[in-house]
């Protein structure tokens, strides 16, 4: 039915492309006109187009400038007058963006034609020759492709990109012009792999760069960001448009700041997001790196906005006692319970076999279900389930016990120590497990949380104890609860680390560290860490040093980060399957752009085997057959472990091959360069998926092109399509074939029920293969189930973050106002007014004058002139106005007093050392806390300057916001965890979170306002004989000791997504143990490192043998 409608009315994408066709013709007309121009005249077109843009926007730009000038010239405007002006500026900025899009649409044909003709000239002529400009001369000093010959500059068509020399041989096709327009219009362009998406991006990047508001080109990894920026840069630089890449430079560096000032900035999604968070932790506007969020173009948009959207960006820092933990102490208990559970599972498997042999399917089913609940990934269990009929027995039993909302499942779990739910990535202790890990001589409640509510009520009602005893008992109860909560959490994370995370699949051990492998890209997420104690648990599990715990300082989801842009667009080869999500979350349309040449790749139906052993043998046989034909082969695997297994199998068969995985990423460029040669076998994880362009030699094309072999279906159809897309690029020949077994994760969890029954019914024996469209469709349905599950998680994550986002917008706007200063005075006046209003109305209804007076003294340090008589008779509005004017007058007098007190010192410093001192540090205190104020000496010395007042207000506002914001984030994190229990009360946790979160935020805003205002009113220079100011000496730039993190939101399977954070350390690297591989004799001298980082050197092995066996330390080589 849908096919008939599509034939009658056409597809949405088809209709979109039809609308763009007239524009393609106009671009090509302009392109033909440019042929008659010389290279200098072609270059002059850029300034001509800029002139058109400036002329169309000159009127609105003039109005904006007039409003800013009004604020600068009239610092004493009232609150209401300032508010009106700032609202007018904001409105004009929005209007300017609309007008800008109109003028860009007007000049689009000329702009696209300029880029296309520049590409043509390089391709056909090999060089461009123009009159040298200052930018040409500067570029020639650092780039070999630009040479200055006399007064001319010669731009060669050869240059370096990612260390490899490239020769420009590309020119934009019509379909690429269409792709460029789709991107410019703020939509997603789906273009087949090999269709030149990197080249397509040059068209809208050039056009939008002419607006001089910044263009951000976002990629999935730093290799692509650096490569693409260097590859495409000359196309822009020839026209005077600057290009840079943020991933080439350190965070917070001057070089990165300059990269953002470039007209076009390339970088990875994570770094763009983290720079935004870092900017919102800066204390000086000169420390900011980003300049706004105007236009973002996201390469591999589905990977960035969908796959990575499950991972909120988080900056975290140290917490008090963060190095104190019980991982090493509790680890042996987890190891013991794991061993006991495995013994139990083995018993169940033996019993199941016995029952099956006796024809007792019901009893066998219960034993199998217990084994499956206790350890679903246990290899002997998986092996047994692959036998004919066994899987269906398990499923039948599971359905029976899951009936009526898992009513009978407790019967199954009763004898187990813990239960694993693979589909939801959860593991929980049973009562038997808790009893087991509690020693016989220990308190039975060691791992049991007390009922805090009822216990507190008991203490409160106990009339036999004094108030002092009541307070002591309450403190002891709360302390006991906190300790037990942390201990239980540590145990839970250790259990997760041992049962849900697999070495060489979810993480690898390199350089004495646990390094996470990104399941989507197969790359090491270098320096990133899981948070919430999970990474520490993995470190304890793998016997490497356990790092310190952290707390959140700043956070944002990628969804909310990218939604800040005025215009957002993206490109990928695989977006259509997620079209609904793009529309719903980002309001982005997907347009499928036709290929330039038809795809010649042959995509075979999946080959399905019963066991992984059969599957890998079949893969090896297929590789042998393909290499004998002289075809290059790319073997895609889902983990480092599988890539190494296949490598060993091929070595045994004497097949020469190369491996690309997270451990061997340094060889990536060399491996990719070789992968297109005849007979070359490349085994790769998902690293060889997105963005990898394998160039085929003529011999390879003649032998049938690149053969893709997938060793397992990924949970996402898009990752499979990306792997297939490495072959058949630009009309090249090629083929793809996936090999699947019923033991694969995807099949085991979601897809193998019907296939297993079908294979059993048809009598398939071990080693036989099934290949049918029905099977491929069944696998695709399984993938859809996972994708739907993941979409639900992402949407839920976004709904939670929307609560935080509305709060973040308010706070970051206030921080920005404080940094830039222009709107800060208005914010402070509003704070003072709100506090005056709150104090008056809070006491007015009850006529409690004493309360009003006490709060005034407490916050403002002011005894109000308003008498009790006036307070009781006047209206509340009159009292607010009168009180506000009085308080404001006191504040102005306070600032004047501080200035008079410090002015002589400033004048003397300027007179004696003004030539050498630029900024000075002035200490301020409110009697409790000290804050250093930094201000320029030259401005402070001017008697009519407001520099001191502005510096005091800025630094105090920033310090107070930052101090309370991190505490508020912790409270919101704790709230998010606690509201999940609302589900047991038949309440929606999200609604509870929204309500409670709003109440927390109101409390937070009041606290911040009161703290800022109180500090401003009470702040003074510490009492000394002289004003204690000092010169601000330039310190070398140091990396801040915090981590950037990504909070994994969980896929349907795979430990690497188990609802945890992933952290990126930016603190200085610490010495790590180089773990020794040798086995020592008992009297040998050895060196060991303990879990706390301490080292014992040249000590006899037998002296530390017990510690080594109990995993308290590791052998190291020095």
Curated annotation (Swiss-Prot):
Gene3D superfamilies noted in UniProt: Helical scaffold and wing domains of SecA, P-loop containing nucleotide triphosphate hydrolases, SecA, preprotein cross-linking domain
Entry coiled-coil feature ranges: none
Entry EC number(s): 7.4.2.8
GO terms of biological process kind: intracellular protein transmembrane transport; protein import; protein targeting; protein transport by the Sec complex
A Pfam match: SecA_PP_bind
Protein keywords: ATP-binding, Cell inner membrane, Cell membrane, Cytoplasm, Membrane, Nucleotide-binding, Protein transport, Translocase, Translocation, Transport
One GO cellular component term noted in the UniProt record for this chain: cytosol
Sites where the protein binds ATP: 176, 194-198, 693
Catalytic activity: ATP + H2O + cellular proteinSide 1 = ADP + phosphate + cellular proteinSide 2
Family annotation (CDD domains): DEXDc_SecA, SF2_C_secA
EC main group: translocase
Annotated stretches, region: Disordered: 1034-1056
Subunit-level organization: Monomer and homodimer. Part of the essential Sec protein translocation apparatus which comprises SecA, SecYEG and auxiliary proteins SecDF. Other proteins may also be involved.
Stated role: Part of the Sec protein translocase complex. Interacts with the SecYEG preprotein conducting channel. Has a central role in coupling the hydrolysis of ATP to the transfer of proteins into and across the cell membrane, serving as an ATP-driven molecular motor driving the stepwise translocation of polypeptide chains across the membrane.
Name of the featured protein: Protein translocase subunit SecA
Lineage of the species this protein comes from: Bacteria, Pseudomonadati, Bacteroidota, Cytophagia, Cytophagales
